[in-house]
Every structure is written in C-alpha cells, then in structure tokens.
C-alpha cells in the first residue's frame, strides 16, 4: 500500500500561534502539521514504525489539535499517515500516556475525546493499514475517507488483549452485530468493507484519495462555521434524549440558530443570490 499522489502537506505549522514548547520534541518529529486551504493537516510521521501511537506521537497529536481548534483560519482538521500505513496501533514499547521528562503523557482516551469534542470537523484520510489502536482515530473522526484496498483489523485478540478503549468510539459506528464479529476474530477487511460496516464513509482508489478528501474539505468550508460546530453537538446529543426531550430541545436549538447572526447572513445571502461571508472567493 502506498500513499496517494498529491500527498498532504508535510511542513511545520503555518500558524504563528503554535508554541513549540508545548510539544515534546522528537527528531524527526512524530507528527507533521500544516494548514492549507482552510484545513489543518496532522500527519502521523513514524513511517518506519507504521505510524504506531507512541507517547510522543499522541502528545504531539493532542497539541496540534489544540492549535487547529484555536486557529480561526482552520475550518476542519485532517488526520493522515506518512508512508504505507495510516496507523498500526499503539507502540507497545512507548505506549500513549507514558511519563516523558517527568510529565504525564496524554492517554489514548484523552486524544480520542479531544477529537470527538473538537468544535471543528475531523476527517480521517486513511492512506493505508489501520490496525488496533489506530482504528480508534478512525472511530473518533467525524468523516472517514479511505483507500479501498487499505487493510483494517481489530487485531488485539491476536496478542491476547482486547480493543477496550477504542470500543468506546468504534462500537457506536459498528453496532453490536459487526462489532462482535470483528472484535472476536481480529479478521482483516478492506476499505470497501469498512464502508459497509460503518467505519468509513467512502472508499476510493489510492490515486483518488487526495481529491476525495479535498471534496469533504470544500463542503465544510462552504458551510457556516457555527452551524458546523452545532451539528457536531447535535449528532451526539439527540441519541441521548427521549423523543419528547429531543423535540423540545431541538425546537429551541433551531430557533436559536435561525435568530443567530450566522443564520441571518446565510439567509440573506440566499435571498440575494450571493455567497455568504464565510465562503472565501
């Protein structure tokens, strides 16, 4: 499996607010960060280790998420991998959450929650193999586009452990039916099957991955930023409510959005047959 042509940007952050002191340094860096066209690209950068989730990598990933969330130029966040794999899972020699230089590391649970709670959409661009803990990133992401031939596996049972933490973000997508079989067997499946079982939204040939991800970025950038953030909350909130609670809460929610400045601008733009202010010309 190879990365798609027109690979994501691999430079350091273009955001001047990034504070290097908040990110433990590794040489080379375990992640890469760049902003392009409204998207912050966070690239897992341990290709020789198949982008395994080390303590340093997860610390950097978490810090980059905070940078992207705080940057008004960033409308969405893209997670991808450098090299032939997306992410092979946790690094068993230096697992996430390990103490580094006397500081407690960010746990896998912490970073998955950070992805889900981010007010900006997180897109997973699956360029290659996604195994075990790496599937936690897939489960936590809001939109998932994958190479059709990329191999997936909840492989934990093969070494006598279980996909415990990542089940929290993967089971809501898989459901009990698919989750049970995939967790029990650790079987491999490809990107097309990932779409069928609910882990991914779209599977494309490798050479089409960049364009497919860009289409998602463009769609998000065309939408109101506050509306997008509220939609993330909406999708997670409604299933927690009873039917009557949901109707009451969403009716009030809808009213707030229609009366908001962003809602007024969007409706005015529609009436005047122009682009709303948040769409860059």
Please describe what each predicted stretch is:
Residues 182-183, 231-234, 250, 254, ...:
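Short alpha-helical scaffolding segments that buttress acidic/His motifs in well-ordered protein cores
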Residues 1-14, 18-82, 113:
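Conserved CoA-thioester-binding segment of acyl-CoA-metabolizing enzymes
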Residues 2-6, 26-41, 45, 188-220, ...:
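Amphipathic alpha-helical segments at domain termini/boundaries
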Residues 113-226, 259-260, 264-268, 274:
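Crotonase-fold acyl-CoA enzyme core
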Residues 56, 60, 107, 114, ...:
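Charged catalytic carboxylate motif
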Residues 81-115, 130, 241-242:
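Glycine- (often His-adjacent) and acidic-residue-rich active-site loop
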Residues 42, 46, 60-61, 79, ...:
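Terminal peptide-recognition signature
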Residues 65, 86, 152, 270, ...:
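Conserved hydrophobic/aromatic "anchor" residues
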């Amino acid at each position: 499996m190879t990365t798609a042509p027109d690979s994501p940007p691999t430079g350091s952050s273009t955001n001047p607010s990034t504070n290097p002191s908040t990110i433990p340094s590794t040489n080379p860096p375990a992640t890469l960060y760049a902003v392009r066209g409204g998207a912050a690209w966070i690239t897992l950068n341990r290709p020789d280790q198949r982008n395994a989730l080390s303590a340093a990598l997860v610390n950097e990933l978490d810090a980059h998420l905070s940078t992207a969330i705080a940057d008004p130029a960033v409308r969405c966040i893209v997670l991808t991998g450098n090299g032939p794999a997306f992410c092979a899972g946790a690094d068993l020699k230096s697992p996430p959450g390990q103490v580094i230089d006397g500081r407690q590391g960010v746990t896998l649970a912490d970073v998955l929650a950070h992805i889900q709670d981010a007010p900006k959409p997180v897109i997973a661009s699956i360029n290659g193999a996604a195994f075990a803990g790496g599937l936690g990133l897939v489960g936590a992401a809001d939109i998932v586009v994958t190479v059709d031939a990329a191999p997936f596996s909840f492989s934990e049972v093969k070494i006598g452990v279980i996909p415990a933490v990542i089940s929290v973000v993967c089971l809501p997508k898989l459901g009990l039916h698919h989750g049970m079989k995939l967790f029990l067997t650790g079987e491999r499946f490809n990107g097309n099957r990932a779409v069928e079982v609910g882990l991914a939204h779209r599977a494309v040939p490798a050479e089409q991955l960049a364009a497919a991800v860009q289409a998602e970025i463009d769609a998000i950038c065309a939408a109101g930023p506050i509306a997008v953030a509220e939609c993330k909350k909406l999708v997670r909130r409604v299933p927690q409510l009873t039917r009557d609670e949901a109707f009451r809460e969403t009716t009030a929610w809808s009213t707030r959005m229609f009366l908001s400045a962003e809602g007024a601008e969007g409706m005015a733009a529609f009436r005047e047959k122009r682009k709303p202010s948040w769409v860059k010309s």
